[in-house]
Amino acid sequence: MSVKIHYQNTHFITSAPDIRHLPADEGIEIAFAGRSNAGKSSALNRLTNQKNLAKTSKTPGRTQLINLFKVTEGCHIVDLPGYGFAQVPLEMKNKWQKSLGEYLQKRECLKGLVVLMDIRHPMKDLDQQMIFWAIESRIPVQVLLTKADKLKSGARKAELLKVRKLAETFGGDVQVDVYSSLKGLGVDQLRAKLDTWFAPALAHLLEDEEGSNSAE
């Protein structure tokens, strides 16, 4: 018996300025991170088939909070603050980076990190920093090269191979795929990846259900 995750049922739970204001550190969380213009909100909306689950800001750098969404019992998606926007004051940038690093290094229920980057400008310094933090904490990483529809097929494949080669040098579990919120490219693969990361929480749910059924 298996549980199918219905990502369209995902709903907003809470926002927090840092790890100390998040709910209890339990279940499984999968975090989404990316530069302010990487298309993170659009990717989350496409993943869940909801137009406004994650608010797409006209002004990059506005999302300063950690946003928590419930997918199903024991399974959560975390939308981390966008980083790397030039017009944000340095003090605020440093605060965000500290908050991001703290979350990636100390949150016990974090079991997967999705790093989104524009396929035309991949693997900037902060993107690589996020991946290094995850690897240090033994968290698997899924890199999504977003806005893949902006490149023709040949250029898209070449960029994918280049980033995959770079990802091999990180030394951790880092997978790289292309993604297009507009065309739906890579959406099914992303759902399949999240399914595997969420699987342990769903297994606990099944055990609890079977236990309560046998008790009856």
Curated annotation (Swiss-Prot):
Domain of life: Bacteria
Residues that coordinate or bind GTP: 34-41, 61-65, 79-82, 146-149, 179-181
SUPFAM superfamilies (UniProt xref): P-loop containing nucleoside triphosphate hydrolases (SSF52540)
GO biological process, one term: division septum assembly
CDD domains, sorted: YihA_EngB
Classification via PROSITE patterns: G_ENGB
Gene3D superfamilies reported in the protein's UniProt record: P-loop containing nucleotide triphosphate hydrolases
Residues reported to bind Mg(2+): 41, 63
Entry's Gene Ontology molecular function annotations: GTP binding; metal ion binding
Cofactor(s) of this protein: Mg(2+)
Keywords for this protein: Cell cycle, Cell division, GTP-binding, Magnesium, Metal-binding, Nucleotide-binding, Septation
Listed GO CC annotations: cytosol
Record domain EngB-type G: where: 26-200
InterPro entries: G_ENGB_dom, GTP-bd, GTP-bd_ribosome_bio_YsxC, P-loop_NTPase
Assigned protein family: Belongs to the TRAFAC class TrmE-Era-EngA-EngB-Septin-like GTPase superfamily. EngB GTPase family.
Protein role: Necessary for normal cell division and for the maintenance of normal septation.
Name of protein: Probable GTP-binding protein EngB
Species: Vibrio vulnificus (strain CMCP6)
Gene it is expressed from: engB
